[in-house]
């Protein structure tokens, strides 16, 4: 599925041309999913679906819930990119992932994150290493 728009969620520090950039927000963890989903809804005239949701670090654990919120709003998710992630707990949302998941490991990743990449591979997710900005742009450009 071709990607319509990239959404950079709070905590991301990457530059992707044409992305919906919500990275400047810093909602508390207990309100993270709701606030980000509302911000995406508020900006819905600025982007096209399906979305490529980019989550970084501990925020990556919110991916299943943010994806569910987008489906509830009738917005298609074309993929997830988790950068140096804390991986989501299996079964947090029963039908997640509903789109391809790519894990990006940066040069700043610590040993715990690198070992978590093994868990991502075991789940059948693509794992890439390198510069997140260029990798995200490349993923978004896939047909």
PLM segments and residue spans:
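The feature captures the conserved acid-bearing segment of alpha/beta-hydrolase catalytic domains
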Residues: 84-140
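Active-site catalytic motif of lipid deacylating hydrolases and related acyltransferases
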Residues: 2-49, 125-130
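Short hydrophobic segments within beta-strands
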Residues: 7-10, 54, 83, 104-106
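Gly/Ala-rich beta-loop-alpha elbow adjacent to hydrolase catalytic centers
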Residues: 52-68
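Residue in the alpha/beta-hydrolase core beta-strand immediately N-terminal to the catalytic nucleophile
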Residues: 50-54, 78-81
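A conserved short beta-strand
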Residues: 73-87
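Flexible, charged surface loops at secondary-structure boundaries
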Residues: 1-2, 44-48, 74-75, 95-98
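Flexible, membrane-associating and regulatory peripheral segments of lipid-active enzymes
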Residues: 1-6, 77, 97, 139-143
């Amino acid at each position: 599925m071709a990607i319509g728009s990239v959404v950079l969620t709070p905590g991301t520090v990457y530059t992707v041309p044409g992305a919906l950039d919500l990275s400047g927000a810093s909602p508390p963890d207990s309100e993270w999913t709701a606030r980000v989903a509302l911000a995406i809804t508020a900006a819905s005239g600025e982007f096209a679906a399906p979305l490529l949701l980019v989550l970084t670090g501990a925020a990556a654990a919110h991916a299943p819930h943010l994806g569910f919120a987008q489906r509830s709003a009738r917005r298609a998710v074309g993929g997830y990119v988790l950068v140096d992630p804390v991986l989501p707990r299996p079964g947090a949302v029963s039908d997640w992932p509903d789109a391809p998941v790519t894990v990006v490991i940066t040069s700043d990743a610590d040993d715990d994150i690198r070992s978590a990449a093994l868990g991502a591979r075991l789940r059948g997710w693509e794992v890439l290493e390198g510069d997140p900005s260029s990798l995200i742009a490349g993923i978004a450009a896939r047909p």
